[in-house]
Structures are given as structure tokens and as C-alpha cells.
């Protein structure tokens, strides 16, 4: 097969190529490439039709980007759903979604109001969530409804993105101090973290006269230790509670009930 070098004499296309002993730099012009293109078609070579040896001028355009200020970012995030979503706790067990909406919407525009229910028993978990339309509405509801009474119960209203222990520590300590001791008492283990003293009392009241109910918590906090005690007025009620409620489900968890 014929080669390009055999067709094009050195003094033609490659006359400027230097020998290995030459100290001068090799020169190669765009005119040479144009000549080579005309011959390359017959050999199936793919060469660009023209290559400029003069590099084009680079046009550099400065692009100015506008940074979003931290204050505007904070403002945007504060208008997010988390800042408008309220936790409403310690509500009456018979309060439903519509009634919760009616109570809250007196103080601001609402998007969603929902009471939480236990998926196993279908009983109200005594708390719900309300999403307001604006942060201002949410703040107004907290101001007007937090620590007010509904159905004889003092409710707690907070923004959900604030860290919540589930209850106010002072309230929890006050409830614990009201626990009535009795020789007729049961131990309840494997309690869900959401179980409150009031919920525990209501759950066991179906099986006897409950004198006191207490979820054991880490001292100085409202963090549940996962167990509690319920006191009754008689031995018969203790036996009835153990027989009926041991291995029953409370707040989605199977509890253990034994004599304390």
C-alpha cells in the first residue's frame, strides 16, 4: 500500500520538518494541512478541512452571581411547614379531627387538623397535629391555647420543629407527686415512650378503681424509662387487671403486667 510520504515529497508537504540532529523547532503551517486534505480523501483519512495555527482570541466574560443572603434563607426556612405545624397534646380522648379544627381555627387559618389514633386499639393517643397557613397563625394559636383547658384537661401546644420531650417537665413532676401508694399495685413493663400517666390510668380504669398511675421517668427529665405502676383499692382488682391486660397492646406495644 502506498503511503502519504511516498506520494508527497519531503520538499513539498514536509519540507519544514527538521532532522533529529537539527536544533531548530519544526514548523507546520495550515497551508500544508490543506494540501494534505486533498490527498487524504483517496485513503479514507479523516482530517479537518482547515486548522488555524493562530489560536483564536478568547473572549472571557465575567459572570456575576448574586448570593442569597443568610437572612433571606432563614426567612424562607422559617416559612416552611415545620414552622407552621403544631403539636397539640393532652387533649380529651373523645376529641375528633373536626372538633380539634373548630377549636384551633378560632385563632388562625388552618390547612390540616388531625388527631392521632392507636393503630391497634383505635383509641385516641390524646394528641394531634395542626398545620396552620402562616407562621403568624401558628404563633397566635400557641399564645392563645397553650396551657388552656379543653374538656377539663390542660393542653400543650408547641411548634413541632422545636425539640419536644412529649410533656412539660414541671407538669410531669407534679403528676408524679400525686401518685397514691397502695399495697395493691401492679408493675407495667414495655411501655411505649408516648404513654403518659393519664393514659396509663385511663387504660387500667376499665378493670377497676385506679388510685394512681405513674410512668417511671429519668429524674429531672420527662424521658420515659419504659415502665410504670398502677395502684388499686383491692387485691381482686389487681388480679383482674393482670388477667385482662397482661400482654395486651397499649400505644402499639405489647405490655407486661405483674404484681409489684
UniProtKB/Swiss-Prot annotation:
Residues 63-83 are annotated as: Disordered. This is Small ribosomal subunit protein cS22. It is found in: Plastid, Chloroplast. Residues 1-62 form a transit peptide. Residues 63-78 have a biased composition (Low complexity). The keyword Oxidoreductase does not apply. It comes from Spinacia oleracea. PROSITE patterns: RRM (PS50102). Component of the chloroplast small ribosomal subunit (SSU). Mature 70S chloroplast ribosomes of higher plants consist of a small (30S) and a large (50S) subunit. The 30S small subunit contains 1 molecule of ribosomal RNA (16S rRNA) and 24 different proteins. The 50S large subunit contains 3 rRNA molecules (23S, 5S and 4.5S rRNA) and 33 different proteins. The keyword Chaperone does not apply. Keywords: Chloroplast, Plastid, Repeat, Ribonucleoprotein, Ribosomal protein, RNA-binding, rRNA-binding, Transit peptide.
Amino acid at each position: 500500500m502506498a503511503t502519504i510520504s511516498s506520494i508527497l515529497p519531503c520538499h513539498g508537504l514536509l519540507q519544514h520538518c527538521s532532522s533529529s540532529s537539527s536544533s531548530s523547532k519544526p514548523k507546520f503551517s495550515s497551508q500544508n494541512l490543506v494540501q494534505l486534505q486533498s490527498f487524504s480523501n483517496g485513503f479514507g483519512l479523516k482530517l479537518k478541512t482547515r486548522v488555524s495555527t493562530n489560536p483564536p482570541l478568547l473572549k472571557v466574560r465575567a459572570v456575576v452571581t448574586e448570593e442569597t443572603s443568610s437572612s433571606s434563607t432563614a426567612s424562607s426556612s422559617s416559612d416552611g411547614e415545620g414552622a407552621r405545624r403544631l403539636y397539640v397534646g393532652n387533649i380529651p380522648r373523645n376529641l375528633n379531627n373536626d372538633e380539634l379544627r373548630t377549636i384551633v381555627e378560632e385563632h388562625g387559618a388552618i390547612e390540616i387538623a388531625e388527631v392521632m389514633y392507636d393503630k391497634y386499639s383505635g383509641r385516641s393517643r390524646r394528641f394531634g397535629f395542626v398545620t396552620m397557613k402562616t407562621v403568624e397563625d401558628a404563633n397566635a394559636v400557641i399564645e392563645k391555647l397553650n396551657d388552656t383547658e379543653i374538656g377539663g384537661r390542660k393542653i400543650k401546644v408547641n411548634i413541632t420543629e422545636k425539640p419536644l420531650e412529649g410533656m412539660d417537665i414541671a407538669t410531669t413532676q407534679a403528676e408524679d407527686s400525686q401518685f397514691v401508694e397502695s399495697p395493691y399495685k401492679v408493675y407495667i413493663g414495655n411501655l411505649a415512650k408516648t404513654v403518659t400517666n393519664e393514659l396509663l390510668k385511663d387504660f387500667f380504669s376499665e378493670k377497676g378503681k385506679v388510685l394512681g398511675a405513674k410512668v417511671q421517668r429519668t429524674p429531672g427529665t420527662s424521658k420515659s424509662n419504659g415502665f410504670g405502676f398502677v395502684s388499686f383499692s383491692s387485691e381482686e382488682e389487681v388480679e383482674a387487671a393482670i388477667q385482662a391486660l397482661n400482654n395486651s397492646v397499649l400505644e402499639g406495644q405489647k405490655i407486661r403486667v405483674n404484681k409489684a
